[in-house]
Curated annotation (Swiss-Prot):
Chain sites annotated for binding ATP: 55-62
UniProt enzyme class: transferase
Known function: Transfers the gamma-phosphate of ATP to the 4'-position of a tetraacyldisaccharide 1-phosphate intermediate (termed DS-1-P) to form tetraacyldisaccharide 1,4'-bis-phosphate (lipid IVA).
Family classification: Belongs to the LpxK family.
Gene3D superfamilies: P-loop containing nucleotide triphosphate hydrolases
Keyword Ribonucleoprotein appears in the UniProt entry: no
Keyword Nucleotide-binding attributed: yes
Gene: lpxK
Keywords: ATP-binding, Kinase, Lipid A biosynthesis, Lipid biosynthesis, Lipid metabolism, Nucleotide-binding, Transferase
Highest taxon in the source lineage: Bacteria
Name recorded for this polypeptide: Tetraacyldisaccharide 4'-kinase
One CC-aspect GO term: plasma membrane
Family annotation (InterPro entries): LpxK (IPR003758), P-loop_NTPase (IPR027417)
Gene Ontology terms for molecular function: ATP binding; tetraacyldisaccharide 4'-kinase activity
Organism: Yersinia pestis
Length: 328
């Protein structure tokens, strides 16, 4: 239902407009208070790159964070990542991730980024505290914040917005009548915009999510995803239909599809009921980090990588590298 409302297919959004105007007013006042100097924002001693969204829901932000970390690492830079840690609850903040950190403590996205990139990752509701903790333990050249475009208590050196190229900005209204955290005009003040799928508007950098080989959660075996048989697909991400569409593009026709809420916790009892007989369960990598501890032998996940045009990617990276006093 919420997708129909946000996409403009349902006029029920009209009932939510008073709340949206309130949300928009509060958001504007918060940002204005920092711009006018009424509230002070903390500045990191190393450059901060925000990777965020204008809209709620899955836009492909985490693959962009992973891509950016890996690209800077390949160029010889030391990169740290901070996050709010949505979906996790730690007894102590800030929390520096280790090999023993669980998604229940840190959230699924920080754990995924940590496992994929090997970069130091810290989480805290106050991102400045996360950065301070990270810098006390690691020497880094850049800090990348996973989300946080609207977290104006943190000064930033580069703002990168990720846009869903298919859904774009829906009906254009603020939450909850629409998907917007801030209005579309905010794009005029960011440093770069990456468009995930669909058609990129002028000035936006097009991006595609490219699937890798499927990986077995228990054995680590890799296999072309299109060779998997009797697939039951599941996705607990911001926009599950994107994962199911990726499978269709690979020629995979799942026998069943199960969409779960973003950041949802799973149990063995819950997921084991989704398959029977020769069926296998195929999930996103973000789901896999929450399931590996109790996975069954017929569970697989499908990693995806962000892919950008090389010329646009090089220009973006050069602009970011220029922020470092140690430009390589």
């Amino acid at each position: 239902m919420i997708e129909r409302i946000w996409s403009g297919q349902s006029r029920l959004y009209l009932l939510l407009l008073p709340l949206s105007w309130l949300y928009g007013a509060v958001t504007w006042l918060i940002r204005a208070s920092y711009r006018l100097g009424l509230r002070s924002a903390w500045r990191s001693p190393v450059p901060v790159i925000i990777v965020g969204n204008l809209t709620a829901g899955g836009n492909g932000k985490t693959p962009v964070v992973i891509w950016l970390v890996e690209q800077l690492q390949q160029r010889g830079y030391r990169v740290g990542v901070v996050s709010r840690g949505y979906g996790g609850k730690s007894a102590v903040y800030p929390l520096l991730l280790s090999d023993n950190t669980t998604t229940a403590q840190a959230g699924d996205e920080p754990v995924l980024i940590f496992q994929r990139t090997g970069a130091p990752v810290a989480v805290s509701p106050k991102r400045a505290d996360a950065i301070k903790a990270l810098l006390q333990s690691h020497a880094v050249d850049f800090i990348i914040t996973d989300d946080g475009l609207q977290h104006y208590a943190l000064q930033r050196d580069f703002e990168l917005v990720v846009i869903d190229g298919v859904r774009r900005f829906g009906n254009g209204w603020w939450l909850p009548a629409g998907p917007m955290r801030e209005r579309e005009g905010r794009l005029r003040s960011v440093d770069a915009a990456i468009t995930n799928g669909g058609l990129a508007a002028e000035g936006e950098i097009p991006m595609q999510l490219v699937a890798r080989e499927a990986v077995n959660l228990v054995t680590g075996q890799r296999q072309p995803a299109e060779q998997l048989q009797h697939v039951v697909a599941m996705a607990g991400i911001g926009h599950p239909p994107r994962f199911f569409a990726t499978l269709n593009l690979l020629g995979i026709k799942p026998e069943n599809e199960h969409a779960f809420a973003d950041h949802q916790d799973y149990s063995l009892a819950q997921l084991s009921r989704l398959t029977s007989g020769p069926q296998i369960l195929l999930m996103t990598e973000k789901d896999a980090v929450k399931c590996r501890a109790f996975a069954l032998p017929n569970w697989w996940y499908l990693p995806v990588d962000a892919q950008l045009p090389s010329d646009r990617a090089d220009k973006l990276l050069l602009n970011i590298q220029a922020l470092s006093p140690d430009t390589k």
